[in-house]
């Protein structure tokens, strides 16, 4: 099995960054797919054998009974029938066990098929996070964090909706958290990345369906509000129930021995049935209405909690999660198992004959209500914390899998400084793979970098490279660079403005609103890196240039730092007016018979543009 350590021994330092190391991962996942496909097929063949054996052993039972009834000395046939019955039970047990093994093998097969597809740049089998797209967010919309082909989709292995929400929250929030917190997250991710079998087993539980955390929490919160008389918890009620069951047993024995009329135990059983039904049926109906559909989800949660609790993880954040669900003061496993058994009891109430029998003889509904109340009092206050802990672990599994799948990435150095620090060597965009061209770039606090260049020269991709790698770094993930040193700061982008015709907002008005939002954000959080692609898109060139100058002059009065890509070469003269704050960089192209794109950033102002050249070439071809 490949490990992170083996992969990180080799780092590409060339401008062209091949991902040939990922061929090892592709080979590993391919072998896992082949293994579990073969295993599932073997188990399915065994299942057919069990079905045949089960049928034959079952048919032996009536045959043996028939021979026993017709034979003079049929004791041997009776024994044979008993053995056939025991054989049938054993085969059914093995068949049930084999069925679970088939399901587990198929789930793991699905896990590894998805990872194999990931290595082949097919991310369609992972949730895209479209529900989290927000054009007004400070940076996620511009940096392609959510949606088809997004960073979230590449990372997302979550199997609970709570885990998905937690992962989305991590990627959408880069508030100035302590460096120690980032290091703690990194250690947890690194440890989980090295536990590939644990991650695969965890993900296997969500291959058939996603566990809806919101539905479970909603149901459990409703349970919390269900008002049931606490009398069922009292010793008096327990004594009364015990007395009723005991009297029924005594009167039944007396009636069976001829010492009492049979009418008395029957009448007592009927009275007990109506008493229990009157006292408990309404309460159990409320409970069943709320949680009756949760059984499948709860069983899955029990499996996840068992898996987490049994893991031997040492990293601080991982230990926090384990302690939260299986510490001395809490017992999530016992809680969910008790709730699952309660749901089993509720399911069994659908059998009317059984309900009448067990309530008449054993007051079963009373004990079901009593068990529920005890569970509600003991465990209900902890449920939300346990589910939140599982959601955190679910999100960490996704982050760790991303780290494992991208062995060419390296850990960033996070420095604890009260200013914007961003020093990158050989940085490139994580989506580009072997097509990526790396660049060196350094951002100083409260400085502004104006980047010029022709269309398609690489400006926008470079801006996203800066933003996405920072986002990875502060989430404790490795970055796509030879080396990256960053401090912790806020991030705000303006790259992909959209109009909103439903609210009467034009494209240009949307651009102004975005810049206003940016200014307000910088005033709230002075240590901010702003990334802008073409200020004031949607107006004429001269107005755009003057407006851009005015905006940059105003933003320069704030304690912010920025990178601004533009086609307006005149805007580069800001560096002449304020050389201590503004700096020019460019992506140059070479024009000859064809255009050569280097995708390398260099100091200075771009000299060559390509719009007219490309248009003329297009017209000539027609």
Predicted regions, residues:
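Alpha-helical coupling/stalk and coiled-coil linker elements that connect catalytic or binding modules
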Residues: 20-454, 462-491, 513-514
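Low-complexity, intrinsically disordered or signal/transmembrane-proximal segments
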Residues: 8-11, 16-19
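ATPase nucleotide-binding head domains, primarily ABC-like/P-loop NTPase cores
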Residues: 399-402, 406-622
């Amino acid at each position: 099995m490949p490990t992170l350590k083996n992969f990180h021994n080799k780092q590409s330092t060339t401008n062209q960054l091949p991902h040939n190391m990922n061929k090892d991962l592709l080979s590993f996942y391919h072998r896992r797919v082949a293994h579990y496909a073969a295993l599932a097929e073997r188990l399915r063949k065994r299942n057919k054998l069990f079905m045949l054996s089960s049928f034959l052993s079952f048919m032996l039972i009536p045959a043996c009974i028939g021979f026993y009834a017709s034979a003079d000395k049929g004791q041997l046939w009776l024994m044979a029938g008993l053995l056939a019955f025991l054989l049938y039970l054993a085969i059914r047990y093995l068949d049930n066990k084999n069925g679970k093994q088939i399901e587990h093998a198929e789930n793991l097969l699905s896990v590894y098929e998805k990872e194999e597809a990931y290595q082949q740049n097919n991310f369609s089998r992972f949730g895209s996070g479209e529900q989290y797209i927000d054009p007004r967010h400070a940076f996620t919309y511009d940096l392609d964090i959510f949606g088809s082909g997004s960073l979230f989709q590449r990372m997302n292995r979550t199997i609970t909706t709570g885990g998905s929400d937690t992962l989305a929250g991590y990627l959408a929030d880069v508030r100035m958290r302590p460096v120690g917190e980032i290091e703690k997250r990194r250690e947890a991710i690194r440890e989980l990345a090295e536990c590939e079998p644990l991650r695969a087993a965890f993900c296997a539980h969500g291959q058939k369906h996603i566990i809806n955390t919101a539905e479970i929490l909603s149901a459990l919160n409703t349970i919390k509000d269900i008002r049931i008389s606490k009398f069922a918890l009292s010793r008096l009620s327990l004594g009364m129930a015990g007395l009723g069951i005991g009297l029924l047993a005594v009167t039944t024995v007396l009636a069976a021995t001829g010492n009492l009329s049979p009418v008395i135990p029957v009448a007592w059983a009927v009275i007990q049935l109506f008493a229990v039904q009157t006292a408990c049926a309404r309460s159990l109906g409320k409970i069943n209405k709320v949680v009756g559909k949760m059984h499948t989800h709860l069983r899955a949660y029990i499996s996840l909690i068992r898996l987490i609790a049994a893991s031997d993880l040492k990293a601080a954040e991982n230990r926090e999660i384990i302690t939260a669900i299986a510490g001395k003061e809490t017992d999530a496993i016992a809680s969910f198992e008790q709730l699952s058994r309660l749901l089993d009891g509720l399911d069994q109430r659908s059998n009317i004959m059984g309900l009448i029998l067990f309530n008449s003889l054993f007051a079963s509904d009373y004990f079901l209500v009593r068990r529920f109340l005890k569970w509600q009092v003991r465990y209900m206050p902890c449920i939300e914390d346990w589910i939140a802990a599982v959601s955190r672990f679910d999100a960490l599994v996704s982050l760790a899998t991303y780290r494992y799948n991208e062995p060419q990435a390296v850990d960033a150095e996070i420095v604890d400084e009260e200013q914007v620090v961003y020093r990158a060597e050989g940085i490139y965009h994580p989506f580009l793979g072997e097509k990526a061209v790396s660049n060196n770039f350094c951002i100083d606090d409260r400085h502004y970098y104006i980047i010029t260049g022709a269309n398609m020269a690489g400006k926008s991709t470079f801006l996203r490279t800066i933003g996405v790698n920072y986002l990875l770094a502060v989430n404790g993930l490795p970055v796509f660079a030879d080396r990256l040193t960053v401090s912790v700061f806020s991030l705000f982008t303006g790259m992909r403005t959209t109009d909103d015709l439903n609210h009467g907002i034009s494209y240009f008005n949307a651009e102004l609103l975005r810049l206003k939002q940016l200014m307000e954000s910088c005033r709230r959080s002075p240590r901010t890196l702003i990334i802008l692609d073409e200020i004031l898109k949607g107006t004429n060139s001269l107005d755009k240039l003057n407006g851009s100058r005015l905006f940059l002059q105003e933003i320069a009065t704030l304690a912010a730092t920025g990178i601004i890509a533009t086609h307006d070469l005149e805007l580069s003269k800001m560096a002449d007016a304020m050389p201590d704050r503004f700096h020019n960089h460019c992506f140059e192209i070479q024009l000859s018979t064809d255009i050569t794109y280097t995708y390398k950033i260099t100091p200075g102002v771009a000299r060559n543009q390509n719009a007219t050249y490309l248009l003329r070439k297009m017209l000539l071809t027609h």
